[in-house]
Regions:
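Non-heme Fe(II)/2-oxoglutarate
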Residues: 71, 75, 79, 84-182
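Residues marking the start of alpha-helices
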Residues: 36, 111-112, 199, 271
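Short, charged low-complexity intrinsically disordered segments located at boundaries
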Residues: 153-163, 197-203, 313-316
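Catalytic core of non-heme Fe(II) oxygenases with the double-stranded beta-helix
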Residues: 173-174, 179-308
Length: 349
């Protein structure tokens, strides 16, 4: 649940890339004929060394935490059957048809299914709470969530690798073959919402190709997940009796249930509704595919004008983003607290 990493206003102005064997060979020849690159500058070398040091420190902290973990079995590099909801484990073992039958399409391009066992959700939350109290550095998920933690920094990298490889990718490959068929890395984190902290999250798209979102608990009211349309969706006015299909048109509101997952493309606009009471924790996995990100399909999405800016049906108010839509105030008044959040996000703070 975070802002898109590619600036739309810059993306749709970019020229369409054209690839050919001749062009590739010409580039290869130019590379061979060009002088060797100069040695890195002192500034570049210092930046690389600083990044390497931070990475080594993160690995060391993760190893330190794993050595005294509350539930050591959670750090296994293989998915354990007891981690999964029985129905999901059976679907994984039943082949493609069983997997497809297990996932319910609750809205166009949005799939819900039981995934994690209640015991796994409870133990993972307990482990992450223990890490928060351990005194070790906590890596926050992104610029839009002030609370939560990146799971790799807690030592869960191999666990999440296995979860992606054995559970997420087999289903994503069936539902989203272009975006999810060849995922090769991920960014996985936990987010939390409660009164006095983050209440919800503004409308956005994710910096992912496929997003998995699983509720871990606890008790709460409100805090739904609202879906609108896809980046680059048609802005044409709907026919009589049909719903508009633009990026900023309402599609579906999901009610979170412990252990139940939502799977969708990263470019599907969505936002976390404000929590009314209690506290909600969710496991988020952003899956990314290097091959898809080099494809014309991926690049073309950011050459399109932002939805609903060139005529067509007006946006639904619930689908407006005060941090991302520069025309927000043409439709809604911007409250002072939202103005402060928008200004902070644009400053990168």
């Amino acid at each position: 649940e975070a802002e898109e990493e590619v600036p739309v206003e810059a993306g749709w102005m970019a020229p369409e890339p054209r690839f050919s064997l001749r062009g590739a060979l010409e580039l290869f020849e130019a590379m061979l004929c060009a002088p060797l690159e100069a040695e890195p500058t002192a500034q570049e070398r210092a930046a690389w060394e600083a990044a390497a040091t931070r990475h080594a420190e993160t690995l060391a902290d993760a190893a330190t935490y794993r050595a005294g973990a509350l539930h050591p079995q959670l750090f296994e590099p293989r998915v354990q059957p007891r981690w999964l909801a029985p129905s999901f484990a059976a679907a994984l073992g039943g082949g493609p048809h069983a997997l497809l039958a297990h996932a319910e399409e609750v809205a166009a391009g949005v799939y819900a299914f039981d995934m994690l066992s209640e015991a796994f959700c409870t133990q993972l939350l307990a482990e992450l709470a223990r890490h928060e109290e351990s005194g070790l550095p906590v890596v926050r998920p992104n610029t839009m969530n002030n609370y939560g933690v990146v799971l790799n920094a807690c030592g869960f990298e191999r666990t999440m690798d296995a979860l992606q490889r054995d559970c997420v990718t087999p289903l994503a490959r069936l539902l989203f073959p272009q975006q999810g068929g060849d995922a090769d890395h991920h960014h996985t984190f936990m987010v939390q919402y409660r009164q006095g902290e983050d209440l919800g999250l503004d409308m956005h798209t994710d910096a992912s190709d496929i997003t998995l979102n699983v509720c871990l608990g606890k008790e709460f009211t409100g805090a739904g997940l609202t879906f609108c349309g896809l980046r680059g969706a048609s802005t044409a006015a709907a026919a009589p009796g049909e719903q508009p299909k633009g990026e900023r048109h309402f599609s579906y509101r999901h009610t979170h249930v412990k252990g139940r997952a939502i799977l969708h493309c990263g470019h599907h606009r969505h936002g976390a509704d404000d929590i009314a009471s209690g506290e909600r924790f969710n496991l988020i996995m952003w899956s990314k595919s290097s091959s898809y990100r080099l494809s014309q399909g991926f690049l073309a999405r950011y050459q399109l004008r932002p939805s609903d800016r060139a005529g067509g049906a007006p946006p639904d108010p619930v689908c407006l983003s005060y941090t991302h839509d520069d025309d927000y105030e043409e439709y809604l008044e911007l409250a002072p607290d939202k103005r402060a959040k928008r200004d902070a996000s644009r400053r990168g703070g």
